[in-house]
Amino acid sequence: MRMIAMTATKTMWASHLIRFGRLAKLIAIAVAAIALLAPRYSVCADSAPNVVLNTGKAGPRSVESPTERVILRDYKFAWANLEQAMESSSTAPLSGLFVGTANAWLTDAVASQRRNGLSSRYLNQNHKVDAVFYAPEGDMIELEDTADYDLQILDGDKTVHNEHVVVHYVVLMTPAADRWVIRQLQAVPQF
């Protein structure tokens, strides 16, 4: 009987050690993944777009404070993702924040860059955004964004163009399941 108990105890400890070994491997893989990905995302965090949103002119409905916070968050995140997509010449960073014509335009721009072996950087982004229309049903907002940033175009690691630009964008955003998305992002000469 004692022999059976000792064998059962050894089997139990062996099973715990195997589980612990698997857990240790899983933790090691997770730490390695974080170590590899952290530099990529920390760069983005350091260069987050500066966005100031004014909803005072919006009508016919006023923008509620929680909605304003979410729109501001998602607009900033969209520009950070746009910057990543253009720099990496990949649509992977877009996270579904661009839909409709905005997504089509951005996908085409990324594909064109990739075909030509180029990439772009949108550095030191500042966006002064005015909400000019907020639908009575709360299902669409029109924004006017005066954006200024440093635009760099690169061929591999070599900068082939570098300029400070001021661009006016008309933006249409609509709510999705858990965020606001950009449906239209159109550069215009002036407001």
Cite the ranges covered by each PLM segment.
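Contiguous, function-dense segments enriched for cysteine-driven chemistry
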Residues: 48-49, 55, 59, 63, ...
